[in-house]
Regions:
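N-terminal beta1-alpha1-beta2 submodule of the flavodoxin-like/Rossmannoid cofactor-binding fold
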Residues: 1-106, 111, 167-195
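Cofactor-binding loop segments of dinucleotide-utilizing enzymes, especially the Rossmann-like FAD-
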Residues: 8-9, 39, 128-131, 162
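Short, solvent-exposed amphipathic alpha-helices that sit
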Residues: 15-27, 140-153
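Short, well-ordered coil/turn elements that cap or connect secondary structure elements
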Residues: 29-31, 55, 119, 151-154
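Hydrophobic anchor at the start of a short beta-strand
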Residues: 34, 156-157
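Short, glycine-/small-residue-rich phosphate/pyrophosphate-handling segment
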Residues: 110-152
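Beta-strand-loop-alpha "switch" segments that mediate conformational coupling across diverse proteins
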Residues: 157-164
Length: 195
């Protein structure tokens, strides 16, 4: 199983990265091939609204550092998106990545019963960390993003949320957060029925 992990945090060694790394390490131990992309180290733009992916090509026409990431998702089985909450939402780097996934839709995706260019049955793990300990805050983030990926054909989707982590190291000191990351990896790596 091929896992593409997209880290949306500007802090390469922060809480978001720690939880994502724990998930990826557990998945590797279970046989996954893992590729990690730190978005903050890449040079790319968000969607330019040019519509070339609907009129000229079946991929995004922008050629930048995100090209490899988009192709890895296309070829992979599992997408891990990890983000801290910045100003009540995902980071701008992750948002720009999500915008660029628009190229996964076929031109007539509004009416086509098969709207995605991706192979169906991919799995999504959404890792959300936040400084706020109140779990009712920012609880809507995943519910806004998941429908996009369901339209792309992702069918086994998981939310891994860690609240109340501000300083680097906070997540690692919380055993339940690290256990949840490992347990989620076990669920994701479990054989899918019928395969």
């Amino acid at each position: 199983m091929k896992v593409t992990c997209v880290l949306g945090s500007p802090r390469a060694n922060g809480n978001t990265a720690a939880v994502a790394q724990r998930f990826c390490n557990a998945a590797e131990k279970l046989g996954a091939s893992v590729q990690i992309f730190v978005l903050n180290t890449l040079n790319y733009k968000g969607c330019q609204g040019c519509m070339a992916c609907k009129t000229k090509m079946d991929k995004c026409v922008l050629q930048d550092d995100l090209t490899e990431v988009l192709e890895s998702v296309r070829e992979g089985d599992v997408l891990v998106m990890a983000t801290p909450i910045y100003l009540w939402d995902v980071t701008s780097r992750l948002r720009a990545f999500i915008e660029r996934t628009y190229s996964y839709f076929v031109p007539d995706f509004h009416t086509n019963p098969h709207p995605s260019r991706l192979s169906p049955g991919k799995k999504l793990v959404f890792i959300q960390t936040q400084g706020q300990a109140n779990e009712s805050l920012f609880a809507d983030i995943f519910s806004r993003i998941e429908p996009i990926f369901k339209r792309y054909g992702f069918t086994d989707n998981h939310l891994l949320r860690v609240c109340g982590v501000r300083k680097p190291g906070d997540a690692e000191s919380r055993g339940e957060a690290m256990r949840l990351a490992e347990e989620t990896a076990q669920k994701v790596m479990a054989p899918t029925k019928g395969k």
